[in-house]
A protein has these predicted regions:
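Acidic carboxylate diad motif detector
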Residues: 1-42
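Positively charged, helix-rich recognition surfaces that bind polyanionic ligands
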Residues: 32-40, 45-257
């Protein structure tokens, strides 16, 4: 459902694109910067065509900047990202959840249509458009959030979690937040702002360590333990906030090593 051309086989002038010997009108979402190296045309499940351009631009190196640092723990209880301080939390819209009833209805209508009929094709198209809307909304939010975080922080620390394992355990919630896609976008955006993204090893016991005295509490391995009191220094911890603080501390240690 896609094909590519190198710089010889394509050209763009205004809103006209030449692919091989054919010319097509297209909607230009933004101006093309640099020299086109590869052009890819993709067709989505709705039957619409999209043009993706890989361009060569003069390299401008942005040095890492100084500024505020933050550590985030991935949340599943109504918050996408949990920070050491409540005011820095990120509450993400659940785009799939909002469209779930409409998607379920469209799925039922699709399943009742006779195979290979026009009605079935129309029902399939309606369902595909709903899924595409959810995907586009989530992606737009991820880009916006990545830019906001990179403008605000010079260092952003995350735990390098096994997303496939999380998906098996939490399913729709992990898919709806799109953690993996967000991290990919964040790592792409960060260098443009001089922001550094640091990943802490997934086996680092961020939830079990007391962020005040570094006491390790093995009882916190149980995910049902949401709050706990450190037996050593008696500090009361919220599981996710304590983990976020430990992720920040470990990320800064990695950065300075």
């Amino acid at each position: 459902r896609s094909f590519s051309y190198n710089e010889v086989g394509c050209a763009i002038k205004g809103n006209i694109i030449r692919i091989a010997k054919n010319k097509y009108k297209f909607f230009k979402s933004r101006e093309v910067e640099g020299k086109i190296k590869v052009l890819t045309v993709k067709r989505d499940a709705c039957g619409d065509f999209y043009v993706y351009l890989a361009c060569e631009t003069p390299g401008v190196k942005i040095e890492p900047r100084l500024g505020k640092s933050i550590g985030f723990d991935f949340g599943l209880k109504g918050k996408m990202l949990v920070a050491p301080n409540k005011e820095d939390d990120v509450v993400a819209p659940s785009f799939f959840k909002k469209k779930q009833k409409a998607i379920a209805k469209a799925s039922r209508e699709f399943s009742t249509k006779r195979p290979h009929s026009n009605n079935r094709r129309r029902a399939q198209l309606s369902l595909a458009r709903l899924y595409r809307k959810v995907t586009n909304q989530r992606k737009a939010y991820h880009w916006q959030l990545a830019r906001e975080l990179c403008q605000k922080y010079a260092v952003i620390c995350f735990e390098d979690l096994n997303m496939e394992r999380m998906h098996r355990g939490y399913g729709k919630k992990v898919s709806d937040y799109g953690f993996s896609e967000f991290l990919r976008i964040l790592e792409y955006v960060a260098p443009q702002f001089g922001t550094r993204v640091v990943k802490v090893d997934r086996f680092y016991p961020s939830s079990q360590l007391c962020c005040e005295c570094s006491y390790q509490n093995p009882r916190v391995k149980d995910l049902s333990v949401r709050e706990w009191v450190c037996p050593s220094c008696k500090t009361h911890h919220d599981r996710d906030r304590n983990a976020a603080q430990n992720i920040l501390d470990e990320g800064l240690r990695i950065l300075s090593a």
